[in-house]
Regions:
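Positively charged, small/polar-rich N-terminal and surface patches that mediate targeting and assembly
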Residues: 1-88
């Protein structure tokens, strides 16, 4: 759980090895963001509220491939970080 002085940031990680159009990539990021927000509403509503009140910050990063993305996803799950993987 974040301390009161910490700002929360949603981190969206995309795969660099996929050749998606900008629109498709934006849509996939949107799916992930919505699913994470819904999951956070169930699992940690106070953190979600804090995130929203502080500007709902988001950043987009790249993973080189699926294996790297799976490792990041597993690490996030192990640390009890709200996460969601879009599978298309």
């Amino acid at each position: 759980m974040a301390r009161k002085d910490e700002s929360l940031t949603m981190v969206l990680v995309t795969r660099k090895d996929l050749t998606l159009s900008r629109g498709k990539l934006a849509a996939q990021c949107g799916h992930a963001a919505v699913e994470c927000a819904l999951k956070a509403a169930r699992e940690c509503p106070k953190q979600l509220e804090s995130w929203r009140e502080n500007g709902a910050r988001k950043i987009v990063l790249e993973a080189p491939n699926l294996d790297a993305l799976k490792r990041l996803f597993g690490a996030a799950q192990a640390d009890d970080i709200v996460c969601y993987m879009v599978r298309d």
